[in-house]
């Protein structure tokens, strides 16, 4: 294997290093239904928290949301205006709003309150957008960012009143602090290779699950391109997976095309479930996964 600093390539290599065994005896047709925060979805394949999709397709953000609604998937949304979020929720997509770690906590709380008011099922924060990679805090389109403390996360959890999910967790230390703050879920992610040599989210998952002890759902983000990729995450204990960049090229073809790929990935997932003796998502078994050593 050729070594690289590219975290996306490292993540892809890790996915491809995991093999599965089959289990046909006593197997049957599977269900991919998933319940999250009291809502039932047809698939654990979620849309990832993307932003600024108008640069990819006209009305890209609402197309993306409509696709999630058509597929019965959880929809995540990233940075954007209040009006855009209202349009997204109006599509009928059950939406989780991920908020940037704005330096001004009043802006964070304002965005939380607006998201709850318009009907988002949950809110959260991508904590990994705090720094610029050059030793300073990040600045996103002129908006200053800042790392958040455990106490600040507690304040956001209390302000939300709905589940608060933290995205960008890639260590046991951060996972433990998020639990201490009262967060209702974690997204294991390196934000599309924001840091070189980052641990693949799927590699970090088992230790994070061990540390959290099943108290909150844990999701996997980054590099998921197929139902087989999703299966590997779910088998190792993830509640659901986020798919973003893999879907972006389809936005120009409309919501139906994006939904079609989500549906295909869900069917691929079901295909692997049936061949490994898994009838429901809560019966996933990590012992079907083997790490390639040749």
Model-identified regions with their sequence ranges:
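Short glycine-enriched loops at secondary-structure junctions
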Residues: 51-53, 78-84, 128-129, 172
């Amino acid at each position: 294997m050729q070594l690289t600093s590219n975290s996306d390539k490292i993540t892809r290599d890790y996915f491809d290093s995991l093999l599965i065994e089959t289990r046909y005896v006593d197997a049957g047709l599977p269900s991919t239904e998933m319940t999250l925060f009291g809502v039932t979805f047809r698939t654990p394949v979620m849309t990832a928290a993307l932003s600024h999709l108008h640069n990819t397709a006209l009305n890209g953000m609402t197309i993306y949301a409509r696709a999630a609604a058509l597929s019965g998937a959880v929809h995540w949304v990233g940075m954007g205006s209040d009006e855009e979020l209202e349009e997204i929720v109006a599509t009928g997509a059950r939406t989780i709003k991920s908020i940037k770690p704005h330096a001004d906590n009043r802006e964070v709380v304002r965005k939380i309150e607006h998201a709850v008011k318009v009907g988002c099922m949950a809110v959260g924060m991508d904590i990994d957008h705090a720094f610029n990679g050059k030793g300073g805090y990040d600045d996103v389109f002129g908006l200053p960012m800042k790392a958040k403390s455990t106490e600040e996360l507690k304040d956001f959890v209390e302000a939300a009143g709905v589940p608060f999910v933290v995205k960008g967790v890639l260590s046991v230390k951060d996972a433990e602090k998020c639990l201490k703050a009262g967060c209702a879920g974690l997204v294991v992610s390196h934000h599309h290779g924001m840091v070189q040599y980052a641990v693949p989210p799927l590699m970090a998952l088992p230790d994070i699950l061990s540390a959290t002890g099943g108290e909150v759902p844990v999701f996997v983000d980054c590099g998921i391109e197929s139902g087989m990729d999703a299966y590997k995450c779910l088998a190792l204990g993830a509640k659901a997976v986020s798919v973003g960049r893999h879907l972006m090229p389809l936005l120009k073809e409309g919501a139906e095309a994006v939904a079609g790929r989500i549906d295909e990935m869900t069917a691929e997932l079901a295909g692997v479930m049936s061949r490994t003796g898994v009838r429901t998502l809560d019966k996933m078994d990590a012992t079907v996964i083997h790490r390639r050593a040749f």
